């Protein structure tokens, strides 16, 4: 049975890719902090594939699309991808290329891989650079193509920070700050960056 909604979304995405000069577009399951479970705003992969599992990467190109996921989700992915035109790539199965291998085998010199670099781990970005540089393939890191297509996209999460009670946290904010400052002074640190 065809999934016209997903097929139409992929058609819009491919048109946007062509407009932006992108030949392959990648969408992982991630947010700006590389969380495994993401807020609805970041469910871009799900929006374009119908796959709702917590782990997977969608890759779209001119005449195809593929979803890479692990063994926990093979059955779920088969069901949810049915009729979408998205092919399932079963990670770690014999004969199934990794995303890097697929890109290396299918991208040609001068082509461009695009993705929203804010949701790709730096380590993965460097891995793609290394693999694709040999073939003189460009990478466009700053492309959130979903934003112009997903018109009813949920709002970006903007909740307030919640301070946990000492019963849960074990110590007060003041105690934690004092301990941190003492450790910094002991180690000769002038600043501490927390992300």
Residues covered by each model-derived region:
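Terminal domain-start leader segments
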Residues: 1-195
């Amino acid at each position: 049975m065809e999934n016209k909604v997903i097929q139409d979304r992929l058609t819009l995405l491919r048109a946007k890719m062509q407009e932006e000069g992108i030949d392959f577009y990648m969408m992982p399951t991630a947010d700006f902090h590389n969380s495994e479970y993401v807020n609805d705003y970041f469910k871009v992969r799900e929006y374009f594939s119908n796959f709702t599992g917590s782990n997977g990467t969608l890759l779209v190109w001119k005449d195809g699309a593929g979803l890479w996921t692990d063994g926990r989700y093979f059955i779920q992915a088969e069901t949810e991808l049915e009729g979408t035109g998205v092919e399932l790539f079963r990670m770690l199965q014999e004969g199934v290329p990794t995303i890097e291998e697929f890109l290396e085998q299918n991208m040609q010199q001068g082509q461009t891989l695009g993705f929203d670099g804010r949701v790709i781990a730096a380590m993965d970005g460097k891995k793609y650079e290394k693999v694709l540089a040999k073939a003189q393939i460009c990478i466009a890191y700053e492309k959130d193509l979903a934003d112009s297509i997903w018109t009813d996209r949920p709002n970006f999460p903007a909740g307030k920070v919640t301070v946990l009670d000492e019963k849960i946290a074990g110590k007060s904010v003041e105690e934690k700050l004092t301990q941190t400052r003492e450790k910094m002074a002991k180690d000769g640190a002038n600043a501490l960056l927390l992300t």
